[in-house]
Amino acid sequence: MSRVAKNPVKLPSGVEVKLVGQLLSVKGPKGTLELIIHSSVEVEIVEEAGELRFAARNGDQQTRAMAGTTRALVNNMVQGVSQGFERKLQLVGVGYKAQAKGTVLNLALGFSHPVDYELPNGITAETPSQTDILIRGIDKQLVGQVAAEIRDFRRPEPYKGKGVRYADEVVRRKEAKKK
């Protein structure tokens, strides 16, 4: 059995889990997420203990790995509908600005035109200051994907460090060429 799948997923109060066929839906105070469970993974809902248990239907390596992956995905779903996920981005550079307007994030990144990024459903963006962006949502994968797409508009360059970076990212700097 996968070492990850051995640990059950604890369900916090206010989180409901339903399994209909292969479709697992997790409902919490922040919203609802669904996942199609792979046919080689068995999911057991233990109501008394308030937890989910995962097991591989047979013992081969790929099935055990799939059980661990499914457990990790469901754990992220439970955490997402109860607490949510957030990613912080920083804009470093002269004239780099961000402004959130509803479902559109307006970015000035040193191009000749402003960049308008349409946020997908379930994702919200805040701009506490002009150079900080907070991306929030219940789907961990989608929050990370949106943050990566925004960062890709202007990645941090190694000479001056200008660009869009994650708040916890360390940009490796290079020395300028000498004559």
Swiss-Prot record:
Subunit architecture: Part of the 50S ribosomal subunit.
Q: Which domain of life is it from?
A: Bacteria
Q: Which family does it belong to?
A: Belongs to the universal ribosomal protein uL6 family.
Q: What does this protein do?
A: This protein binds to the 23S rRNA, and is important in its secondary structure. It is located near the subunit interface in the base of the L7/L12 stalk, and near the tRNA binding site of the peptidyltransferase center.
Any one GO MF annotation of this record: rRNA binding
Any GO BP annotation: cytoplasmic translation
Q: Name one GO cellular component term.
A: cytosolic large ribosomal subunit
Q: What is the lineage of its organism?
A: Bacteria, Pseudomonadati, Pseudomonadota, Gammaproteobacteria, Pseudomonadales
- This protein is called Large ribosomal subunit protein uL6
Q: Sorted alphabetically, which NCBIfam families does this protein's record hold?
A: L6_bact
Q: Per the UniProt entry, what species is this protein from, by scientific name?
A: Pseudomonas savastanoi pv. phaseolicola (strain 1448A / Race 6)
InterPro entries, alphabetically? Ribosomal_uL6-like, Ribosomal_uL6-like_a/b-dom_sf, Ribosomal_uL6_a/b-dom, Ribosomal_uL6_bac-type, Ribosomal_uL6_CS
Check the record and name the HAMAP family matching this protein. Answer: Ribosomal_uL6_B
Q: Which UniProt keywords apply?
A: Ribonucleoprotein, Ribosomal protein, RNA-binding, rRNA-binding
RNA-binding: is it a keyword of this entry? yes
